[in-house]
UniProtKB/Swiss-Prot annotation:
<dbReference type="Pfam" id="PF08089">
    <property type="entry name" value="Toxin_20"/>
</dbReference>
<feature type="propeptide">
    <location>
        <begin position="23"/>
        <end position="48"/>
    </location>
</feature>
<keyword id="KW-0800">Toxin</keyword>
<keyword id="KW-0964">Secreted</keyword>
<comment type="similarity">
    <text>Belongs to the neurotoxin 12 (Hwtx-2) family. 02 (Hwtx-2) subfamily.</text>
</comment>
<dbReference type="InterPro" id="IPR012625">
    <property type="entry name" value="Hwtx-2-like"/>
</dbReference>
<feature type="disulfide bond">
    <location>
        <begin position="71"/>
        <end position="82"/>
    </location>
</feature>
<keyword id="KW-0732">Signal</keyword>
<protein>
    <recommendedName>
        <fullName>U4-theraphotoxin-Hhn1a</fullName>
    </recommendedName>
</protein>
<dbReference type="GO" id="GO:0035792">
    <property type="term" value="C:host cell postsynaptic membrane"/>
</dbReference>
<dbReference type="GO" id="GO:0005576">
    <property type="term" value="C:extracellular region"/>
</dbReference>
<feature type="disulfide bond">
    <location>
        <begin position="52"/>
        <end position="66"/>
    </location>
</feature>
<comment type="function">
    <text>Neurotoxin active on both insects and mammals.</text>
</comment>
<feature type="disulfide bond">
    <location>
        <begin position="56"/>
        <end position="77"/>
    </location>
</feature>
<feature type="signal peptide">
    <location>
        <begin position="1"/>
        <end position="22"/>
    </location>
</feature>
<keyword id="KW-0629">Postsynaptic neurotoxin</keyword>
<keyword id="KW-0528">Neurotoxin</keyword>
Length: 85
């Protein structure tokens, strides 16, 4: 009877440790996935900077100043370029 009780307690302890380890592994994998959008956002920021620069250059050649309203979403016009605020 004591052996059965000890075996059940050991199995329960192993199950708890295994579940805790699995939760930690899942949390780590989610943290790694969170970093991915940052690289995607960096690419979008670079693309946006390029688009705004080209837009301002086209307007500049057409004897117009860079329009501040063209720069939106955390961007502002500075030195005839849209820059991230």
């Amino acid at each position: 009877m004591k052996v059965t009780l000890i075996a059940i307690l050991i199995c329960a302890a192993v199950l708890v440790l295994h579940t805790t380890a699995a939760e930690e592994l899942e949390a780590e994998s989610q943290l790694m996935e969170v970093g991915m959008p940052d690289t995607e956002l960096a690419a979008v920021d670079e693309e946006r900077l390029f688009e705004c620069s080209v837009s301002c250059e086209i307007e500049k050649e057409g004897n117009k100043d860079c329009k501040k309203k063209k720069c939106k979403g955390g961007w502002k016009c500075k030195f005839n370029m849209c820059v991230k605020v």
